[in-house]
Amino acid sequence: MAELKNDRYLRALLKEPVDVTPVWMMRQAGRYLPEYKATRAQAGDFMSLCKNHELACEVTLQPLRRYDLDAAILFSDILTVPDAMGLGLYFEAGEGPRFERPTDTIDAIKKLSIPDPEDELGYVMKAVSTIRRELNGAVPLIGFSGSPWTLATYMVEGGSSKTFEKIKKMAYAEPMALHMLLDKLADSVILYLNAQVANGAQSLMIFDSWGGALSHSAYREFSLRYMQKIIDGLTRFADGRKVPVTLFTKGGGLWLEAMAETGCDALGLDWTVDIADARRRVGHKVALQGNMDPSMLYAPIPRIEEEVGHILAGYGEGTGHVFNLGHGIHQHVDPEHAGAFIKAVHAQSKRYHK
């Protein structure tokens, strides 16, 4: 593997000194870029794009050709794991992801097998190794998975949900069934993420997109507990250096202290959290990633630059901050505004790293 030329993202996650605050964007390879739309059209549909390792590599690299980003993130989807379990993932226009065979009974859960990441998910591993090779050491490659709770919401509900009624019913009426599902998912994610590291991922992120839908006690029981299990099972060293792990629970600002106790290296923050407050609460234990509202990228460029400055000042001096959005970039954002955002982070953050 080529020597890493820009490692400030990895260094910041480990709270080592950096020259400027590193920056990348969730969903940086996505529909706001015209070149992404062209490649997706070439693939035919979203999952065909994910399953073609050469095209997945191409869209991963596209934002790095445009912008001075400090990390690349594997182009894939969190639902690859349940798809590999045989649920029959498909996408309906305007409806989002759906499953032909939801896992909404204990009998269905018992029948689930843990997928082999080098077999059923081999296309993801081929994408990881291809991207790592093509990056040629330019920036680190982030691998990722959904959290067990978040994956389970889609599996039990049969797709996206606004109320999570079915899975919450299972949580409170049949908790043993849900724990069985979450346990299988945690085991699957451990294998999946470790295989990503073996194929070249240099950092890992666990996306708990729907943890914020849970009550205080239910979050610990049904979400955090299983992310803890994953972290305990991960490969934490590769290529002679630590593989940092970031946990991101959208809507999880209440639980930062508990999340920081898991042994992760960093916490992702959504835009509802004050980053200065987050640093006071957990900055002695973990690095922080975030956390500009993605909708701010619709603002005039001077307003974007102002908000970048506000968040940098909120975090303050020293390392341990990776700048990002508080969630994925929206599809209708002007690519020039995204570029201005990235430039502003690098330009304005120098003063905080002396």
From Swiss-Prot:
Pfam families named in the record: URO-D (PF01208)
CC annotations in GO: cytosol
PANTHER family: METHYLTETRAHYDROFOLATE:HOMOCYSTEINE METHYLTRANSFERASE RELATED, UROPORPHYRINOGEN DECARBOXYLASE
Residue sites binding substrate per the record: R27, Q28, A29, G30, R31, D77, Y154, S209, H327
UniProt keyword list: Cytoplasm, Decarboxylase, Lyase, Porphyrin biosynthesis
Site features described as Transition state stabilizer, chain residue numbers: D77
Classification via Gene3D superfamilies: 3.20.20.210
InterPro entries: UROD/MetE-like_sf, Uroporphyrinogen_deCO2ase_HemE, Uroporphyrinogen_deCOase
Subunit organization: Homodimer.
Top enzyme class: lyase
UniProt KW Iron-sulfur keyword: no
Name of the protein in its database record: Uroporphyrinogen decarboxylase
NCBIfam families to which the protein is assigned, alphabetical: hemE
Intrachain disulfide bonds: none
Family under the similarity heading: Belongs to the uroporphyrinogen decarboxylase family.
EC code: 4.1.1.37
Single GO biological process annotation from the record: protoporphyrinogen IX biosynthetic process from glutamate
Recorded metabolic or biological pathway in which this protein acts: Porphyrin-containing compound metabolism; protoporphyrin-IX biosynthesis; coproporphyrinogen-III from 5-aminolevulinate: step 4/4
Function recorded in the entry: Catalyzes the decarboxylation of four acetate groups of uroporphyrinogen-III to yield coproporphyrinogen-III.
Subcellular location: Cytoplasm
Catalytic reaction(s) noted: uroporphyrinogen III + 4 H(+) = coproporphyrinogen III + 4 CO2
One MF annotation (Gene Ontology) recorded for this entry: uroporphyrinogen decarboxylase activity
